[in-house]
From Swiss-Prot:
Protein name: Large ribosomal subunit protein uL5
Keyword terms, alphabetized: Ribonucleoprotein, Ribosomal protein, RNA-binding, rRNA-binding, tRNA-binding
One Gene Ontology term from the biological process aspect of the record: translation
Example of a GO cellular component annotation carried by this entry: ribonucleoprotein complex
Protein role: This is one of the proteins that bind and probably mediate the attachment of the 5S RNA into the large ribosomal subunit, where it forms part of the central protuberance. In the 70S ribosome it contacts protein S13 of the 30S subunit (bridge B1b), connecting the 2 subunits; this bridge is implicated in subunit movement. Contacts the P site tRNA; the 5S rRNA and some of its associated proteins might help stabilize positioning of ribosome-bound tRNAs.
Example of a GO MF term: tRNA binding
InterPro entries referenced in this protein's UniProt entry, alphabetically: Ribosomal_uL5, Ribosomal_uL5_bac-type, Ribosomal_uL5_C, Ribosomal_uL5_CS, Ribosomal_uL5_dom_sf, Ribosomal_uL5_N
Keyword Metal-binding: no
Alphabetical list of SUPFAM superfamilies matching this protein: RL5-like
Pfam families: Ribosomal_L5, Ribosomal_L5_C
Subunit: Part of the 50S ribosomal subunit; part of the 5S rRNA/L5/L18/L25 subcomplex. Contacts the 5S rRNA and the P site tRNA. Forms a bridge to the 30S subunit in the 70S ribosome.
Protein family according to the UniProt entry: Belongs to the universal ribosomal protein uL5 family.
């Protein structure tokens, strides 16, 4: 059992019951999955760029990413249908908790001028989206071995029904929200 899973079962569940007054244990929101997406726009000219993005993402997430492809051809963007344009990873269970722990305790504090993540990035259904501008904040990525600084989107999918419940869940888990 990971450190964050233990924290969830020992501290977060009682705190959520106290705050929201749940009657049933199954009502308590929990993390369902974390999706990490890396869109690589320059992959349309050079497919080799995608390989380094895939290797970076596999180091960060700890599992092999799948390629995301264009659904339709768009002449203005010079993309064809089924052309690989990025990669994504879906983390669940233990790997999800390990990644969330690493993100909150190690990676986010390494961001320059970090004052906390925005508390407004909820989608209305209890899911939280977070954009990261550079992959260098993760300890697995070595500065000398990257070809280009890339950003990524990280989406926390929860079972919460409202944004307020999801915000409290992530806050109890240790997400550093800006005041």
């Amino acid at each position: 059992m990971t450190r964050l899973q233990e924290k969830y079962s020992k501290e977060v569940i009682p705190a959520m019951i106290e705050k929201f007054g749940y009657k049933n244990v199954m009502e308590i929101p929990k993390l369902e999955k974390i999706v990490i997406n890396m869109g690589v726009g320059e992959a349309k000219e050079n497919q080799k760029v995608l390989e380094s993005a895939v290797s970076d993402l596999s180091l960060i997430a700890g599992q092999k990413p799948i390629l995301t492809r264009a659904k339709k051809s768009v002449a203005n963007f010079k993309i064809r249908e089924n052309m690989a344009l990025g990669c994504k990873v879906t983390l669940r269970k233990a790997k999800m908790y390990e990644f969330a722990d690493k993100l909150m305790s190690i990676a986010l504090p390494r961001v320059r001028d970090f004052r906390g993540v925005s508390a407004k990035a909820f989608d209305g259904r209890g899911n939280y989206s977070l954009g990261i501008k550079e992959q260098l904040i993760f300890p697995e990525i070595e500065y000398d071995k990257i070809d280009k600084v890339r950003g990524m989107d990280i989406i926390f999918v929860t079972t919460a029904n409202t944004d307020e419940e999801a915000r409290e869940l992530l806050r109890f888990l240790g997400m550093p929200f800006a005041q």
